[in-house]
């Protein structure tokens, strides 16, 4: 009897999880960042081979960046604030199709492909999932998360003390070996994003999610075109 109850509990839990987390191809509530912020720059890493897998990622058919309309409205506030301080946004990634996340997981499970180890110089490939650097589900797929940095108005580099997708403690927002300038630059980005309604995470200084995201349980899978 206990075994039957356990099986029923597992089945019920699986059904609840399936209902709670939906996959959708509906992009009607999304828009390109370029339609709202006309001076943002782009370096869409997963459209190229310049990422930890060393290959272009599934679902990226163009070097464009989309977000939910709610997230875009908030991002515009941050961009306006930063523009007044002499900065522009450089976008590395925003909405990410579920098929791209599946591509990451398939790469992790391929023992014959180490990708580009410059992105994880001090870790084993298997550590990327163990350390929660890569997961089977990503907030990016819900459409209100963005990876970005600052550039100056003339397009010149702003030193943030590390680059995108560097799987290292250097990427932690509060890494204590940063220079004073690097700390200041990270804080400028952080303060503008938080003021606009986003929240960061403890492992990646470039990663922000809209606090009141409109689709907290939906994972989208349409291509970036």
Which residues does each PLM region occupy?
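Conserved metal-phosphate-binding beta-hairpin within the catalytic cores
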Residues: 208
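Extracytoplasmic cell-surface/polysaccharide-interacting catalytic and binding patches
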Residues: 19-94, 99-203, 212-225
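C-terminal segment of classical bacterial N-terminal signal peptides
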Residues: 13-19
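Sec-dependent N-terminal signal peptides
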Residues: 4-13
């Amino acid at each position: 009897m206990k075994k039957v109850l356990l099986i029923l509990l597992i089945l019920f839990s699986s059904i609840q999880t399936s209902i709670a987390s939906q996959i959708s191809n509906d992009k009607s509530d999304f828009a390109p960042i370029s339609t709202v912020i006309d001076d943002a720059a782009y370096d869409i890493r997963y459209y190229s081979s310049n990422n930890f897998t060393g290959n272009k990622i599934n679902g990226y058919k163009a070097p464009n960046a989309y977000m939910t309309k709610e997230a875009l409205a908030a991002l515009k506030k941050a961009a306006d604030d930063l523009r007044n301080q002499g900065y522009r946004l450089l976008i590395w990634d925003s909405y990410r199709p579920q098929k791209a996340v599946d591509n990451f997981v398939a790469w992790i499970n391929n023992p014959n492909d180490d990708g580009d180890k410059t992105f994880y110089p001090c870790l084993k490939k298997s550590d990327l999932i163990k350390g929660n650097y890569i997961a089977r589900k990503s907030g990016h797929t819900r459409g209100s998360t963005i990876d970005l940095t600052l550039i100056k108005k003339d397009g010149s580099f702003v030193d943030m003390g590390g680059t995108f997708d560097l799987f290292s403690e250097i990427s932690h927002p509060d890494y204590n070996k940063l220079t004073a300038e690097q700390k200041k630059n990270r804080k400028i980005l952080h303060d503008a994003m938080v003021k606009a309604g986003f929240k960061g995470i403890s492992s990646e200084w470039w990663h922000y999610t809209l606090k009141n995201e409109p689709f907290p349980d939906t994972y989208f899978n349409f291509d970036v075109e």
